[in-house]
């Protein structure tokens, strides 16, 4: 007689589901932003290469992975509607294991952040608090289509950039670094808005007021494209003012290519979002590194 093992719920997580829980595909943006921060300082790492590598691990697998675990746990009811095959609603990570994993990774993130010095630790504390504030009740900032994507954009692009610069320079980043990092974080609000399209139906049912829910897919997509373009136009303008016309020209070319991709996106926002994430967003983050090289060595004159 055969036994249907699916009738018996798991007591421990499925190993593959653990990797799905922390979503490695999401680690690239903060790692890339962290590297942009290290480049923008204009200092050769030298003996600090271990700090650079440790910061990459912290920004990606640890803090970003922890935020994904926390979000998956807090979103398990929404995911049961949107994506029932995800690790927690499918039962592959049973009981409260998702919560325990998120808490363990929180502690581990803080411990590693402590090793990066006061600036690295401070940024880690901010990132950890932001991750929980985004997902957990009663705060749950992701319910807002404005605050939620804004917080994620700041933690995915601005905070890692700031951290990479601060860790390598062992001090507060310059005005130029902070300004460019904040502008790219502002533009990333549009990227995060596009990311909300995949959860449109579940967000409607569970009261998550994402911009696609509040404004409709067409208007939300236009707003996202406007925000992304505005941020890059401001960066281009500043680079010209700061005497970096070649770098400004490269970012302009990348923006023009994005505008063509945006035209395709706006024809079918919900259907073309995955495509745009692989094309337009890639061009956006390439511009980040160009800007990082542009501001290397810039100093405020007395």
Curated annotation (Swiss-Prot):
Gene3D superfamilies named among the record's database cross-references: UbiA prenyltransferase (1.20.120.1780)
Pathways involved: Porphyrin-containing compound metabolism; bacteriochlorophyll biosynthesis (light-independent)
MF terms in GO: transferase activity, transferring alkyl or aryl (other than methyl) groups
Location(s), subcellular: Cell membrane
GO cellular component, one term: plasma membrane
Membrane protein topology class: Multi-pass membrane protein
Any one GO biological process: light-independent bacteriochlorophyll biosynthetic process
Coarse class of the protein's main subcellular location: membrane
Domain of life: Bacteria
A Pfam cross-reference name: UbiA
Keywords assigned: Bacteriochlorophyll biosynthesis, Cell membrane, Chlorophyll biosynthesis, Membrane, Photosynthesis, Transmembrane, Transmembrane helix
PANTHER family listed in its UniProt record: CHLOROPHYLL SYNTHASE (PTHR42723), CHLOROPHYLL SYNTHASE, CHLOROPLASTIC (PTHR42723:SF1)
Stored NCBIfam families: chlor_syn_BchG, PRK07566.1
Cited function: Catalyzes the esterification of bacteriochlorophyllide a by geranylgeraniol-PPi.
Name by which UniProt lists this protein: Bacteriochlorophyll synthase 33 kDa chain
């Amino acid at each position: 007689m055969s036994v249907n093992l699916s009738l018996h719920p798991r007591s421990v997580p499925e190993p593959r589901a653990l990797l799905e829980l922390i979503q490695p595909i999401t680690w690239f943006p903060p790692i890339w932003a962290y590297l942009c921060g290290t480049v923008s300082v204009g200092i050769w790492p030298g003996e600090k290469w271990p700090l650079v590598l440790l910061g990459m691990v912290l920004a990606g697998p640890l803090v970003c992975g922890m935020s994904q675990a926390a979000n998956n746990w807090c979103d398990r009811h929404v995911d049961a509607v949107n994506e029932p095959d995800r690790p927690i609603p499918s039962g592959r990570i049973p009981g409260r294991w998702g919560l325990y994993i998120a808490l363990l990774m929180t502690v581990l993130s803080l411990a590693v952040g402590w090793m990066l010095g006061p600036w690295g630790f401070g940024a880690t504390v901010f990132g950890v608090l932001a991750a929980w504030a985004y997902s957990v009740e009663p705060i749950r900032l992701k319910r807002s289509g404005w605050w939620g994507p804004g917080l994620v954009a700041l933690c995915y692009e601005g905070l890692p950039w700031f951290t990479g610069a601060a860790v390598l320079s062992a001090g507060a980043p310059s005005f130029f670094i902070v300004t460019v990092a904040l502008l790219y974080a502002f533009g990333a609000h549009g990227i995060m808005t596009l990311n909300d399209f995949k959860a449109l139906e579940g967000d409607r049912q569970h009261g998550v007021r994402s911009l696609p829910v509040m404004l409709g897919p067409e208007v939300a997509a236009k707003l996202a494209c406007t925000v992304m373009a505005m941020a890059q136009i401001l960066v281009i303008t500043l680079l010209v003012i700061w005497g970096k016309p070649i770098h400004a020209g490269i970012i302009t070319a990348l923006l023009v290519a994005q505008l063509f991709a945006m035209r395709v996106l706006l024809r079918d926002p919900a259907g073309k979002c995955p495509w745009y994430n692989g094309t337009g967003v890639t061009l956006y983050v390439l511009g980040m590194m160009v800007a990082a090289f542009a501001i290397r060595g810039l100093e405020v004159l007395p």
